[in-house]
Amino acid sequence: MTNIRKTHPLMKIINDAFIDLPTPSNISSWWNFGSLLGLCLIMQILTGLFLAMHYTPDTTTAFSSITHICRDVNYGWIIRYLHANGASMFFICLYAHMGRGLYYGSYAFQETWNIGVILLFTVMATAFVGYVLPWGQMSFWGATVITNLLSAIPYIGNTLVEWIWGGFSVDKATLTRFFAFHFILPFIILALAIVHLLFLHETGSNNPTGIPSNMDKIPFHPYYTIKDILGALLLILTLLMLTLFAPDLLGDPDNYTPANPLSTPAHIKPEWYFLFAYAILRSIPNKLGGVLALLLSILILAFIPMLHTSKQRSMMFRPFSQFLFWVLVADLLTLTWIGGQPVEHPYMIVGQFASILYFLLILVLMPTASLIENKLMKW
């Protein structure tokens, strides 16, 4: 008799995706982040669901409802902080996952990569609208500043901003719709993640060498299920350490002050995971130019498959490209640091240099290094 997991219509899908899936035998721990992102998403949906049961999306009671969750609801404080710090863990895994894709040339699977870029935009949108919900000072002013960027769009800008606000400023209507968006978007992310996986399983996984591994595959279970469980345990441990010992480490103290439209915080800044893009936005003195640079800093990822000039897929055997990749990582860390600093000398000039270097690396230096490496292969 054939095993039920191979015959049952539903079990067959699970079997082909997580049990009998032929997987390259040499994929490293950098391939763990996909499953960790799935885990993060499930955790965020579950903690978010329980938070939504006690939260009120109204300007007069939103801040108080968060206080109520933390003080009066059974284990409400841990649910709230797991959700807030879970977002940080989500982005750590997301950036590691993208870095892996860049380094090992996983972007050659174009459909998978493009869905990934769409997923990144969706996750960023979800995190942004979610940050507005506690209705603290940084929530309010963050929402005001970021939505206001759309007014840079010629002709329709101002109308568009007021349409998104649902009025003439960030107010009750804005908060209510942002709550609705924050509730629906994770389910859209879940659907997109399934499509992402569907496209990946059409081609099979890449591996560190970038060479086809069809002749050397092993079943996903038990080899990679156990490896994923180890990754999951490390993720949960890190999240619990952060949540239980330093829950406010990554948050902004200003968000413990209720939103006040009459008083602007000294330094308006987003959460750490958006700081690199915020630094690029601020480094351009022109409003429309800044908005375009901000959009392009993420959208540039969609053009990476077209910028691949190397004859090799992975960077494993390409020292020049490896060096430039780590320069890019250092540059992004620099931008993240600059984004959290006030707009004054010397931070401004450092931010401008780092922003130019970011685009220069991706558009010019890395493709050029690949061409040089192609020439060196003929020696």
UniProtKB/Swiss-Prot annotation:
The cysteines covalently paired via disulfide bonds are: none
Pfam family name, one: Cytochrom_B_C
Please state what the protein is called: Cytochrome b
Q: How does it sit in the membrane?
A: Multi-pass membrane protein
The cofactor named in the record is: heme b
Instruction: List the PROSITE patterns.
Output: CYTB_CTER, CYTB_NTER
Q: What else is known?
A: Heme 1 (or BL or b562) is low-potential and absorbs at about 562 nm, and heme 2 (or BH or b566) is high-potential and absorbs at about 566 nm.
Q: Which residues bind heme b b562?
A: 83, 182
Example GO biological process term?
Answer: mitochondrial electron transport, ubiquinol to cytochrome c
Q: Which organism is it from?
A: Eubalaena glacialis (North Atlantic right whale)
Gene Ontology molecular function = metal ion binding; ubiquinol-cytochrome-c reductase activity
GO CC term (a single one): respiratory chain complex III
**The keyword Aminoacyl-tRNA synthetase belongs to this UniProt entry's keyword annotation:** no
Q: What does this protein do?
A: Component of the ubiquinol-cytochrome c reductase complex (complex III or cytochrome b-c1 complex) that is part of the mitochondrial respiratory chain. The b-c1 complex mediates electron transfer from ubiquinol to cytochrome c. Contributes to the generation of a proton gradient across the mitochondrial membrane that is then used for ATP synthesis.
- Self-association state and partner proteins as the record states: The cytochrome bc1 complex contains 11 subunits: 3 respiratory subunits (MT-CYB, CYC1 and UQCRFS1), 2 core proteins (UQCRC1 and UQCRC2) and 6 low-molecular weight proteins (UQCRH/QCR6, UQCRB/QCR7, UQCRQ/QCR8, UQCR10/QCR9, UQCR11/QCR10 and a cleavage product of UQCRFS1). This cytochrome bc1 complex then forms a dimer.
Q: Where are the transmembrane segments?
A: 33-53, 77-98, 113-133, 178-198, 226-246, 288-308, 320-340, 347-367
What's the chief localization of this chain?
mitochondrion
| Binding-site residues for heme b b566, renumbered to this chain | 97, 196
